[in-house]
């Protein structure tokens, strides 16, 4: 037995098929357009969480500097990122006297060179704490700085720990020691205060970092906020990623806090 479709029946079938094709095509186009947007939104959320975690870490080590916290742990949701203390920047202190925290306390990343009487150069290879996620790198180097796809973002998330009064420039530096590296969805990092030492007889200091321009602007801002500058720049061009600040009308006090990370 043969069945014959009239013109109206054929039109309904074709119309239904066209509707299905249009719906499937539209869904595909929406997916293609929206997928990068959704992925970018997820990356931004993960980045913001990493920034928040690094800011909380800064608060932790600041408490350790002042002795109000000795050891603690923190769980961090990395969502595919990584965290390590493998990188460092160079910090050199020129002082007339080694502080008690360094006398008789050798460390492989500290090199004290006695040039002459009352002239000591202390080279400190200061390890930073870094989070890498979604093409960005968040670096804790006293301040919290960012690199985006290999380029330095000139605006810091958090300024370096610099305080300037009319008679003293205070600078806090944090050195993360150990051999820490972790990655994945969720990690745990342990912090333990190793020691804090204070350089009080500083004639000058030199800092070499890829974030030199940010450091320079932070020092300029802090020094310009007081009528009498206790210290001033000796080298500020950052051509070789280096700045040097010398004692002027006041004093320089540098607080080094060494934190073990595991």
UniProtKB/Swiss-Prot annotation:
The chain crosses the membrane at residues 13-35. Keywords: Membrane, Transmembrane, Transmembrane helix. InterPro entries: DUF7289. The keyword Membrane applies. It is a single-pass membrane protein. GO terms for cellular component: membrane. This is Uncharacterized protein AF_0759. It comes from Archaeoglobus fulgidus (strain ATCC 49558 / DSM 4304 / JCM 9628 / NBRC 100126 / VC-16).
């Amino acid at each position: 037995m043969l069945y014959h479709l009239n013109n109206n029946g054929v039109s309904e079938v074709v119309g239904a098929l066209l509707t299905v094709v249009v719906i499937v095509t539209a869904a595909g186009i929406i997916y293609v357009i929206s997928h990068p947007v959704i992925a970018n939104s997820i990356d931004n959320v993960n980045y913001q969480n990493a920034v928040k975690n690094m800011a909380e870490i800064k608060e932790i080590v600041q408490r350790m500097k002042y002795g109000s916290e000795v050891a603690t742990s923190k769980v961090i949701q990395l969502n595919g990122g990584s965290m390590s203390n493998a990188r460092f920047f160079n910090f050199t202190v020129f002082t007339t006297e080694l502080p008690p925290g360094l006398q008789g306390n050798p460390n492989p990343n500290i090199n004290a060179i006695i040039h002459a009487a009352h002239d000591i150069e202390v080279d400190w290879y200061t390890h930073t704490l870094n989070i890498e996620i979604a093409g960005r790198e968040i670096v804790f180097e006293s301040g919290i700085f960012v690199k985006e796809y290999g380029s330095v973002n000139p605006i810091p998330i958090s300024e370096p720990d610099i305080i300037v009064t009319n008679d003293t420039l205070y600078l806090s530096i944090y050195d993360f020691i150990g051999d820490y590296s972790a990655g994945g969805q969720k990690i745990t990092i342990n912090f333990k205060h190793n020691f804090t030492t204070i350089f009080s007889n500083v004639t000058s200091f030199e800092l070499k970092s890829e974030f030199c321009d940010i450091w320079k602007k932070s020092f300029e801002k802090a020094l310009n906020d007081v009528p009498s500058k206790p210290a001033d720049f000796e080298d500020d061009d950052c051509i070789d990623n280096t700045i040097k600040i010398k004692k002027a009308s006041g004093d320089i006090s540098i607080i080094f806090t060494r934190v073990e990370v595991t």
